[in-house]
């Protein structure tokens, strides 16, 4: 289905928050990073960043540069099968690089942080046991911290700290506010043109209750409301675009909070 470009619905960018002062970017020495892993100085590389900051592409480039690396996803919605366009899986971008923790539970279920932490621990151990370098990549702050900071949410469900990384090297992907706004708007147009509405209609037709799709938020929340006739197309577009911009700001706020807690993030500008 061909849809008109709706970016002009947001001429003044209402509701888009300003981003705090950007961190100073670095240039990383990739061979030195690979050697640090081989020497045991680090046991996980984590590539994080807000939505539309190029983190997946950067992680794939990094994996190729290292040569024997695999990617573990830290995305709270890419775990669901059949939720492809709205979550931006872009699986073709991985090419020959193996990936994990994507498409592991059916759409309609409600995967929780305890399940993710356990699945990550298993995948991380498997990658290391095969002599490969694990690269965690994503923008879900709670998922990242559950994997890298040995969070034990409760005594019954939390994974023991010894099963999780102890020496993570964090890399953050940076884009300017102007570029972030442009990327998010362009990507939303592309997803609508690529069949986002049809994907969500298909999920509803498969028997997944609308309230479950609303629970997933962002694309699944607002497009479901449009499909159900509760929003016009223009209302859906404006609300969704602004929600994604707000979400990107919250992600960056989370990562800067990690820094205030003592986490060193090496910020880079992805090519």
Mark where each language-model region is:
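Alpha-helix/helix-capping structural signal
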Residues: 77-78, 141-142, 221
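Gly/Ser/Thr-rich helix-start
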Residues: 50, 87-89, 139-142, 151, ...
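N-terminal phosphate/diphosphate-binding loop that engages ATP/GTP or pyrophosphate donors
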Residues: 12, 23-29, 36-45, 56-135, ...
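Residue-level signal for inorganic ion chemistry
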Residues: 75, 102, 139, 195, ...
């Amino acid at each position: 289905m061909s849809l008109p470009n709706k970016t002009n619905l947001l001429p003044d960018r209402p509701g888009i928050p300003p981003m705090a002062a950007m961190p100073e970017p670095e240039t990383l020495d990739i061979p030195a990073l690979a050697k640090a892993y081989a020497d045991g100085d680090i046991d996980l590389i984590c590539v994080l960043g807000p939505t539309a900051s190029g983190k997946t592409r950067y992680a794939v480039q990094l994996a190729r540069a290292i040569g024997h690396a695999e990617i573990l996803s830290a995305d709270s919605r890419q775990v669901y099968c059949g939720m492809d366009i709205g979550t931006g899986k872009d699986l073709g971008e991985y090419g020959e690089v193996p990936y994990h923790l994507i498409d592991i539970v059916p759409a309609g279920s409600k995967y929780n942080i305890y399940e993710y932490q356990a699945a990550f621990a298993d995948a991380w151990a498997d990658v290391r046991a095969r002599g490969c370098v694990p690269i965690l990549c994503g923008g879900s702050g709670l998922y990242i911290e559950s994997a890298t900071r040995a969070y034990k949410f409760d005594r019954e469900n939390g994974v023991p700290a010894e099963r999780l990384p102890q020496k993570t090297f964090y890399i953050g992907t940076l884009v300017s506010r102007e570029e972030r706004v442009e990327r998010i708007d362009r990507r939303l147009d592309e997803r609508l043109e690529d069949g986002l509405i049809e994907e969500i209609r298909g999920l509803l037709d498969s028997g997944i209750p609308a309230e479950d799709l609303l629970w997933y938020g962002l694309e699944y929340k607002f497009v479901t409301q449009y499909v159900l006739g509760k929003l016009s197309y223009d209302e859906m577009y404006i609300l969704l675009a602004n929600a994604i911009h707000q979400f990107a700001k919250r992600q960056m706020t989370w990562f800067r909070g990690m820094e205030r807690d003592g986490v060193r993030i090496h910020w880079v500008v992805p090519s």
